[in-house]
């Protein structure tokens, strides 16, 4: 019986390290990709090889995103992400991230959004050792605005 508890304890410790690694990897990816967008006025393609489904903060119907991503280019992009929480569903395979995205932006060929303030939920899958987005839901927070984009075209 003592041996059983040692094994059980060992599994619990190893599992917690796996989960902690996933959490930190995804948080870092969200922060790094946001910093890239702020510096380059364009987004990083982090979509799954299967593409993704998204609800955008501008409202409207669900958007189907190709694996190549969506062409997000901005005249300016000044967004901060904060309060990132990650829930690991299956260690090293699937997780959900939730966070806030706040600032201002002007997507190319769309109106400026001066008080962008949204809640973000994203489902991630691990593909060949890299976390990729499979689904996203962006919803505006009361007092803020969502994006002015309404189409992938």
Functional labels for PLM-detected ranges:
Residues 67-110:
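Surface-exposed, charged secondary-structure patches
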Residues 2-10:
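Sec-dependent signal peptide recognition
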Residues 11-46, 147-153:
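Short, low-complexity N-terminal intrinsically disordered segments enriched in polar/charged residues
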Residues 52, 60-61, 102-105, 139-142:
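Solvent-exposed loop/turn segments at secondary-structure junctions
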Residues 30, 34-41, 48-51, 56, ...:
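Sec/Tat-exported extracytoplasmic proteins
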Residues 117-145:
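Short beta-strand edge/turn micro-motifs at domain boundaries
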Residues 37, 47-63, 72-76, 108:
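A short gly/proline-enriched turn/hairpin at secondary-structure junctions
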């Amino acid at each position: 019986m003592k041996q059983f508890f040692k094994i059980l304890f060992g599994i619990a410790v190893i599992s917690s390290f796996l989960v902690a690694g996933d959490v930190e990897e995804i948080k870092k990816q969200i922060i790094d990709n946001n910093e890239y967008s702020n510096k380059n006025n364009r987004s990083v393609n982090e979509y799954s090889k299967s593409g993704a489904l998204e609800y955008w903060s501008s409202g409207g119907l669900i958007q189907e995103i190709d694996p190549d991503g969506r062409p997000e280019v901005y005249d300016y992009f000044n967004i901060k992400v904060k309060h990132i929480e990650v829930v690991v569903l299956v260690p090293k395979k699937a997780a959900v991230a939730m966070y806030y995205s706040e600032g201002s932006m002007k997507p190319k060929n769309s109106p400026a959004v001066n008080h962008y303030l949204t809640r973000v939920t994203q489902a991630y899958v691990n593909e060949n050792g890299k976390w990729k987005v499979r689904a996203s839901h962006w919803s505006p927070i009361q007092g803020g605005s969502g994006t002015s984009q309404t189409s992938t075209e």
